[in-house]
């Protein structure tokens, strides 16, 4: 764990702030998956041990509280990596089992993120700061929104074949209509509904969108 002296540093955490739905296959090789799993397990073990020690001490409580927050934040960061891996796998192979697992993992992550936010706000207030708290709490809210909106994200994939390009549109959970346009305009519920991959033979701008219930 890194010794972090203020709550400001505790939210400047790269893993939590990286985009959830920007997928790069190299992130999901077996070595990275295994390393993140170990990272998650060890950070949670440290977190539990710190909680136990915190309940037994009578001095230096603020130091333990900062360490607990840091350990839990590290754990939640590893949870986000795991969720991202799972969402990517579901996008590539949208079976009922994978979709159900991704939705369950999303709920678990949101619960943990909510607890992390509460711990962060408590630590911030303990420092008696009256400024910028909303700036950092909004980052937590954005992370949660990205998870909640994951099902509406449309992934546009293209395959070049001779003189034409085939366009495929996908969502992670494959459970709602996809609306699209090929003239660069923003799609709405009156736009074309995607049913199967389609070919384009000239330069155009494809835009697609889903709309939640």
Predicted segments with their positions:
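Substrate-binding groove of N-acetylhexosamine-processing glycoside hydrolases
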Residues: 1-154, 158, 177
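Short, compositionally stereotyped local motifs that mark structural "simplifiers"
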Residues: 143-213
């Amino acid at each position: 764990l890194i010794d972090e002296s203020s709550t400001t540093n505790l939210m400047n955490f790269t893993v939590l702030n990286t985009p959830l739905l920007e997928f790069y296959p190299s992130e999901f090789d077996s070595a990275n998956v295994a390393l993140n799993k170990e990272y998650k397990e060890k950070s949670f073990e440290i977190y539990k041990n710190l909680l136990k020690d915190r309940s037994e001490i009578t001095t230096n409580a603020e130091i333990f509280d900062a360490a607990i927050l840091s350990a839990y934040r590290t754990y939640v960061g590893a949870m986000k990596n795991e969720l991202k891996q799972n969402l990517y796998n579901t996008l590539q192979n949208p079976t009922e089992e994978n979709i159900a697992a991704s939705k369950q993992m999303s709920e678990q992550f949101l619960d943990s993120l909510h607890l992390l936010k509460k711990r962060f706000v408590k630590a911030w207030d303990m420092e008696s700061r009256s400024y910028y708290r909303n700036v950092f709490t909004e980052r937590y809210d954005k992370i949660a929104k990205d998870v909640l909106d994951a099902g509406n994200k449309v992934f546009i994939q293209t395959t070049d074949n001779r003189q034409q390009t085939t366009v495929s549109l996908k969502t992670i959970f494959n459970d709602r209509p996809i609306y699209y346009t090929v003239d660069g305009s923003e799609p709405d519920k009156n736009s074309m509904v995607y049913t199967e991959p389609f070919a384009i033979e000239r330069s155009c701008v494809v835009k697609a969108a889903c709309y939640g219930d």
